[in-house]
UniProtKB/Swiss-Prot annotation:
Residues 1-32, 99-102, 169-182, 235-260, 326-349, 425-427, 485-493 are periplasmic. GO terms for molecular function: acetate transmembrane transporter activity; glycolate transmembrane transporter activity; symporter activity. It comes from Shigella flexneri. GO terms for biological process: plasma membrane acetate transport; sodium ion transport. It is found in: Cell inner membrane. Its main location: membrane. This is Cation/acetate symporter ActP. HAMAP family: Acet_symport_ActP.
Amino acid sequence: MKRVLTALAATLPFAANAADAISGAVERQPTNWQAIIMFLIFVVFTLGITYWASKRVRSRSDYYTAGGNITGFQNGLAIAGDYMSAASFLGISALVFTSGYDGLIYSLGFLVGWPIILFLIAERLRNLGRYTSADVASYRLKQGPIRILSACGSLVVVALYLIAQMVGAGKLIELLFGLNYHIAVVLVGVLMMMYVLFGGMLATTWVQIIKAVLLLFGASFMAFMVMKHVGFSFNNLFSEAMAVHPKGVDIMKPGGLVKDPISALSLGLGLMFGTAGLPHILMRFFTVSDAREARKSVFYATGFMGYFYILTFIIGFGAIMLVGANPEYKDAAGHLIGGNNMAAVHLANAVGGNLFLGFISAVAFATILAVVADLTLAGASAVSHDLYANVFKKGATEREELRVSKITVLILGVIAIILGVLFENQNIAFMVGLAFAIAASCNFPIILLSMYWSKLTTRGAMLGGWLGLITAVVLMILGPTIWVQILGHEKAIFPYEYPALFSISVAFLGIWFFSATDNSAEGARERELFRAQFIRSQTGFGVEQGRAH
């Protein structure tokens, strides 16, 4: 069961984590030249986009937010691209391949966080912020302490994601392309730095859009071919899958993936609220011109993601029929070649031949590049905008801020490559769960309460936010994944895999208590400023739009 839960954490979109789609032993595959050629075409095309974008990046606004000129539809595709990761594509289809109906329940769980973003966050975030979520949290609170906390929360999440991403990139490429792990990690790191350094948000947005379109096309074709095989009948699809799956009719029974209600609730809360606290997702709402376009972004993103997760369900059941029952895709021991996470890739070969297999492999690699570019830009903006320009050197010019941002991109890229190599054989699945827990326990409570609770003060936000962050990290370390599986202790001090239920509670209680007991003059002034903030958040008066953003 622990392995199943680890696999669950591994499919966080988070994620956007190819690392999580590849769990267990990795068997290097023969060199796939079709995949390599198609991937090189993608790289050349996206580098051309980066060159085009670099000619249009003239200011801080252009670099961080593409000048605020991305449409709601385009931004929705880009946001969906962040979520439609290699982990989602390979991991969830593998989950359906092994567990059946439970895979659909889990994949749809990713969508639960989006109504929160749509109804509670998107409009006010766009009306109050400029470049990062810290702009919103610090709107009426003390700039220095709040920006330091927000930047730390963002950087920890970005660092955890990047490490897991780089390890996953190496493993995934070893599986799909037959290339050396270290070459793959360096290649991803270099391309990531080029996209962000020269093209900024404009380049990363269009890379995400192109990747999302390619992935939706590939997944749609696979699902179409599977349904064609069964006469476009879901009844035939499920019947044939049950007939060949080792579990038989049990693959249609839900409830076998989480061991107890506390774990289920904690995992669900982490996914739901963590989504609303991911820095690279929140940053995308500043790329549109106004709150209306921000709402449209979430609407389109939710539609694309919902469609995609339905496709992965069909792909998973198709893999049961066409891959699981075909000895051509099994090794001598009867296991799927490359592991269960290769189910969707083998299905691509089964329905479209070697050429389509190369296409799907190249798209899977492209998903990694697109997501790491977004993560890197989010981390760089936290350092250059939140820390450098608003804490350490107030009044810095745009040119100085952009220089710091680009230096940070280089540093993050080099660190990501080094750590990707060092963590090659380490268990990094816990990093995804920890990233979501921190986003849900530190970033989300402060952003939400700063926009909705008039009695919030800097003291409450600081103490509650740090308590949430520290609680998430400590409980994750004391839990079964790190304390037992990595550190080798016999029994975990904290019995649950996911800390979000407890760390989120600590954060909200801490923020409420320390704000409610803050009787300082500064606290009173911050409460009085809420009315002006509320008017701005509702009307958008004073918000910068379009080219002036």
